Regions:
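A glycine/proline-hinged amphipathic helix-loop "lid/cap" segment
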Residues: 1-72, 312-319
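Short beta-strand element of the alpha/beta-hydrolase
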Residues: 81-91
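Short amphipathic alpha-helix adjacent to the substrate-entry channel of hydrolases
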Residues: 99-118
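Alpha/beta-hydrolase active-site loop
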Residues: 127-147, 304
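Gly/Ser-rich "nucleophile elbow"/oxyanion-hole loop immediately N-terminal to the catalytic nucleophile
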Residues: 144-159, 179
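Hydrolase active-site cap/lid region
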Residues: 174, 178-229, 243
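Short beta-strand/loop motif that positions the catalytic acidic residue
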Residues: 249-251
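Catalytic active-site module of serine/aspartate enzymes centered on a nucleophile-bearing elbow/loop
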Residues: 294-319
């Protein structure tokens, strides 16, 4: 298939047909509070059930501007020392929540057989740049210290998140590279990340209308987040990546952000970082949240976690 007639999976095509014909306002046409409600409602109709898990509990993490809520997922009620995944949700720094990412985090906890801690960082526009990044760094450092309130003996970290959360994954990993936490980051796992404010990419032109993440949606997020150009937290692609942890980076072939994700993979390679790239061919941005509406996504998620397990075993055999 050419870029003008890209390959689209049949179940992705059906979902897009439904989404693009759906009545009512789009999230970028309403205030942030209403946009967040739309996101929560989408989980209820498009994502898989949370399913059974031994542990789903809420904790409070001290942050730079007050308490940061978080949620712990674990398939085991009793967990010995080991790594944990710290997860930063997507949503353009404006939408998304613990609730909207609960099915995905629970599934990862089951597949990975490690605790997953989802961070409910402050959202823009109420808390613009760099508040989300500040919260994520603070929360990750706190988790790394194995505080009694966490109830886990943390030996290493996996930083992960999707879209805006992919950005937060990378910039948190950069911050901990430059000023290490109590335990190391074993692997960073950004999922279709945003790594630059530069909109001039072929995939941005090809897929910015009709493929879930739209030009209007990206403008809405950009205005709300008010990121400062030239800061490593807004444009990590433009900053050195030497010394970063082993990295698993995923992109989607129908994603406006695809090409900047690929550029980040190349940046890591040039910096001598161990990196693996997985492309979800025929799939769209945001797919980890729509496993029920797009059944083929389950295989994508399982493939990501299998690759992550292999990478973890290589960098930390005791993990």
């Amino acid at each position: 298939m050419t870029e003008t007639t890209p390959f689209v999976r049949p179940d992705v095509a059906l979902f897009l047909q439904f989404l693009n014909a759906a009545p009512g306002p789009k999230f970028w046409e309403v205030p942030a509070a209403e946009a967040r409600a739309i996101t929560s409602a989408m989980r209820d109709v498009a994502d898989a059930p949370v399913g059974e898990l031994a542990v789903i509990r809420d904790i409070d993490i001290p942050g730079p501007a007050g308490t940061i809520p978080a949620r712990v997922y674990d398939r085991r009620a009793d967990r010995g020392p080991g790594p944990v995944m710290v997860f930063y949700h997507g949503g353009g720094f404006v939408i998304g929540s613990l609730y909207s990412y609960e099915p995905y985090c629970a599934e990862v906890a089951r597949l990975l057989d490690l605790p997953v801690i989802s961070i409910d960082y402050r959202l823009s526009p109420e808390h613009p740049f760099p508040a989300p990044a500040e919260d994520c760094e603070a929360a990750t450092r706190w988790i790394a210290s194995s505080p009694a309130e966490l109830g886990l003996n943390v030996t290493g970290l996996i930083t992960s998140g999707d879209s805006a959360g992919g950005n937060l994954t990378i910039v948190t990993s950069m911050a901990l590279r430059d000023k290490p936490a109590a335990v190391p980051i074993l692997v960073q796992f950004p999922i279709y990340p945003v790594v630059t404010l530069d909109p001039d990419w072929p995939s941005m032109r090809a897929f910015s209308s009709g493929y879930l993440l739209t030009e209007e949606g990206m403008a809405y997020f950009g205005e709300g987040h008010a990121a400062v150009p030239g800061d490593y937290r807004s444009e990590p692609l433009n900053f050195p990546q030497e010394g970063m942890p082993p990295s698993l980076v995923t992109t989607a072939s129908l994603d406006p952000l695809r090409d900047q994700g690929l550029a980040y993979v190349e940046k890591l390679k040039q910096a001598g970082v161990k990196v693996q790239h997985i492309s979800a061919d025929g799939n769209i941005h945001g797919h980890i949240n729509i496993r029920q509406a797009i059944p083929s996504v389950q295989a994508d998620v399982e493939g990501y976690i299998n690759a992550l397990k292999i990478m973890l075993a290589e960098v930390s055999p005791a993990a």
